[in-house]
Structure formats: C-alpha cells, structure tokens
Amino acid sequence: MTFVVTDNCIKCKYTDCVEVCPVDCFYEGPNFLVIHPDECIDCALCEPECPAQAIFSEDEVPEDQQEFIELNADLAEVWPNITEKKDALADAEEWDGVKDKLQYLER
C-alpha cells in the first residue's frame, strides 16, 4: 500500500509533507508533488501534515480521483526527488479547495 497525492495539491504545492517523510519518497514537479509508490512505507506521517488535505492512503483515494494513483507512479519516475520543505506556490491559498485542477498540472 502507498499514499497518493491528489488533485488539491495542484497549484498549491505545500511541502509540509516532505519534511516529515522518513524515506524521502516525494518527487517535485513545477506545481504538484507526487509520492513514489515503491518507496513509500505507508507510515501515514505525511497525510495529516498536508494543509490542502490532498494526501490519501491508496485504498481511500476518492472515486473521482483514482487516476492520481497511476499519475503519482508515472511522474515519480521522471521528476526530481524533494527532501526539504520549500515555500508553497505564491497563489496557493487562492487555489486551495478549487475542484478539478488536473487540467492545470504542469509536467
């Protein structure tokens, strides 16, 4: 089992989750983070740290966000690893809670 970053992280990219991950399994794109499913140890430390509430256990990913399971796996293979907290995107608060942001994902 793994944890999955979902839609609400797009254009927010808070990195509080990165700071608590004991195995450094987060990967960073221009406006989104993903979790590498083969590196995640299912410790659940990241989930409560996400201000956007965008992280779910794989078996609890909302039905309308199932595509993010595969998206996390795919993008973790090509994006660089992130191991330290950074500032959120400048307009993160404006985007937090906006629905259906997949169209804004920058790869």
From Swiss-Prot:
InterPro entries to which the protein is assigned, alphabetical: 4Fe4S_Fe-S-bd (IPR017896), 4Fe4S_Fe_S_CS (IPR017900), 7Fe_ferredoxin (IPR000813), Fd_C (IPR022569), FdxA (IPR054829), RnfB_subfamily (IPR050294)
Listed Pfam families: DUF3470, Fer4
Gene Ontology MF annotations: 3 iron, 4 sulfur cluster binding; 4 iron, 4 sulfur cluster binding; electron transfer activity; metal ion binding
Record keyword Repeat present: yes
Domain 4Fe-4S ferredoxin-type: 2-30, 31-60
Swiss-Prot/TrEMBL cofactor(s): [4Fe-4S] cluster; [3Fe-4S] cluster
Residues given in the record as [3Fe-4S] cluster binding sites: C9, C17, C50
Protein role: Ferredoxins are iron-sulfur proteins that transfer electrons in a wide variety of metabolic reactions.
Record's protein name: Ferredoxin 1
Biological source species: Stutzerimonas stutzeri (Pseudomonas stutzeri)
